[in-house]
């Protein structure tokens, strides 16, 4: 996970140094790990090591503090020559001894269309179907993307996926690309953001390279275009994309588009484009609910080979409810906090790591959350509580669950009754019964209060890093 910590450090550093400083000093550094709260960095030689200590140590410490490190430490290690060559692959290659000068007025040639072997060059290797967590918020979009990957140009063309930022639209698009590239290595795949498409078109017009530009985008088998809403108001780009769309569609080539809104809500989008975007399937992705957020965090931890207690993942999932990008960022912050402060993963550590970035909030409580916590406390199962059993060891947990759902959610009595397979009068009786019993039975009152705090994530935590 030191790679991820170093990536966040670099993001901080980049805002505080010049491009030349960044490229010269920071880009070649390689993170070697976190040992007893100290970030270990590999550098090329002793001169670089001394230079960092004299000129950039305070900047690095400030970057680590921004990640939650209370007593940040950085150690530098000179890499052996062989390891240096292995770990520093991004250094620029030496210039040819007799390279011919390039005239300044000559534009670089437009890259040719993808050829077999390089059809994933525009795809993010991290975005695949295997690591896409499916939940009620995205199951239709996932199913549609998988169908398109199985039968490109036939199932749904175009596939239009919309939703707020950070919910997985781009992930699904890249997943289709990887799936297709795996099955058909000869297929030509192109992923592009609308902004990049527009900028490349402008450059092509300026350099009289429109033919090459059109050949590039109209000769692909799969075109993935992100943030298509940014076509709005760009008449020349809309004109070009209209003809690109037609060329691909008429050749039965697959088109996948993403947006933050459905086609009908994209203002100043030409009607002919809007109608074409609606030819295939339009599907949306919503914010993930609690269980899906926990599953996403669990997958991220497993991929990073990090063992994090379930209760910590649950706390993060309750704290961050907006989108997946922020959810993953919160997990990274918790990991960095624990690693850099040399403390174990715990609810207290997670709460402290997130306290300065994600303000505590009353996360929305779901009926399934309540049911799961009550079942765990009473040593039974959600299915038994929702079942028809009349034994006391089932009836009491059932009534407690109904009471807490009524108290902690906005669900109506009929909705709660439907969830339990009963009518609203049964729920009303359960709420009244538990309310009455809590006034007479301190032990029951304490149990209900404990469950309430646990469900809301308000249990007392031990101090961390005090």
UniProtKB/Swiss-Prot annotation:
The lineage of its organism: Bacteria, Thermotogati, Deinococcota, Deinococci, Deinococcales. ATP binds at residues 166, 168-170. Residues 339-466 are annotated as: Domain IV, binds dsDNA. One of its GO terms (biological process) is DNA replication. This is Chromosomal replication initiator protein DnaA. Residues 77-121 are annotated as: Domain II. It comes from Deinococcus radiodurans (strain ATCC 13939 / DSM 20539 / JCM 16871 / CCUG 27074 / LMG 4051 / NBRC 15346 / NCIMB 9279 / VKM B-1422 / R1). The keyword Thylakoid does not apply. It is found in: Cytoplasm. Changing residue 202 to A: No strand separation in vitro, wild-type ATP binding. Plays an essential role in the initiation and regulation of chromosomal replication. ATP-DnaA binds to the origin of replication (oriC) to initiate formation of the DNA replication initiation complex once per cell cycle. Binds the DnaA box (a 9 base pair repeat at the origin) and separates the double-stranded (ds)DNA. Forms a right-handed helical filament on oriC DNA; dsDNA binds to the exterior of the filament while single-stranded (ss)DNA is stabiized in the filament's interior. Strand separation requires the DnaA boxes and adjacent DnaA-trio motifs but works equally well with ADP or ATP. Residues 1-77 are annotated as: Domain I, interacts with DnaA modulators. SUPFAM superfamilies: P-loop containing nucleoside triphosphate hydrolases, TrpR-like.
């Amino acid at each position: 996970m030191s790679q991820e910590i170093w990536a966040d450090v670099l993001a901080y550093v980049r805002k505080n140094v010049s491009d030349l400083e960044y490229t010269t000093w920071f880009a070649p550094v390689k993170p070697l790990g976190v040992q007893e709260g100290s970030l270990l960095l590999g550098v090329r030689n002793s001169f670089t090591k001394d230079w960092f200590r004299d000129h950039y140590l305070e900047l690095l410490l400030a970057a680590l503090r921004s990640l939650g490190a209370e007593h940040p430490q950085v150690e530098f290690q000179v890499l052996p020559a062989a390891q240096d060559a292995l770990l520093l692959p991004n250094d620029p290659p030496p210039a040819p001894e007799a390279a011919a000068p390039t005239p300044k007025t000559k534009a670089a040639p437009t890259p040719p269309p993808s050829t077999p072997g390089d059809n994933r060059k525009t795809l993010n290797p991290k975005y695949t179907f295997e690591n896409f967590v499916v939940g009620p918020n995205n199951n239709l979009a996932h199913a549609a993307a998988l169908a398109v990957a199985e039968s490109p140009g036939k199932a749904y063309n175009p596939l239009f996926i919309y939703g707020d930022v950070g919910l997985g639209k781009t992930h699904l698009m890249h997943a289709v690309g990887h799936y297709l590239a795996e099955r058909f290595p000869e297929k030509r795949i192109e992923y592009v953001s609308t902004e990049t498409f527009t900028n490349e078109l402008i450059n092509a017009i300026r350099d009289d390279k429109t033919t090459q530009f059109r050949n590039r985008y109209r000769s692909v088998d799969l075109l993935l275009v992100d943030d298509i809403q940014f076509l709005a108001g760009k008449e020349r780009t809309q004109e070009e994309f209209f003809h690109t769309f037609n060329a691909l569609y008429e050749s039965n080539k697959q088109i996948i588009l993403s947006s933050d809104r459905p086609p009908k809500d994209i203002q100043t989008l030409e009607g002919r484009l809007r109608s074409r975007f609606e030819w295939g399937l339009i599907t949306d992705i919503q914010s993930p609910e609690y269980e899906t957020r926990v599953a996403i965090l669990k997958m991220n931890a497993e991929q990073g080979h990090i063992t994090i207690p379930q209760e910590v993942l649950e706390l993060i999932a309750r704290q961050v409810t907006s989108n997946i990008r922020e959810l993953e960022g919160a997990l990274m912050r918790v990991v960095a906090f624990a690693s850099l402060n040399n403390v174990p993963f715990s609810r207290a550590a997670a709460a402290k790591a997130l306290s300065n970035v994600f303000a505590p909030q009353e996360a929305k409580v779901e009926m399934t959350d309540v049911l799961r916590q009550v079942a765990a406390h009473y040593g039974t199962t959600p299915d038994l509580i929702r079942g028809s059993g009349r034994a006391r060891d089932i009836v009491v947990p059932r009534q407690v669950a109904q009471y807490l759902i009524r108290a902690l959610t906005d669900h109506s009595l009929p909705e709660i009754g439907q969830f339990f397979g009963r009518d609203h009068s049964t729920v009303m009786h359960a709420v009244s019964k538990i309310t009455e019993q809590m006034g007479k039975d301190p032990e029951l009152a304490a149990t209900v209060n404990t469950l309430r705090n646990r469900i809301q994530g308000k249990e007392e935590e031990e101090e961390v890093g005090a």
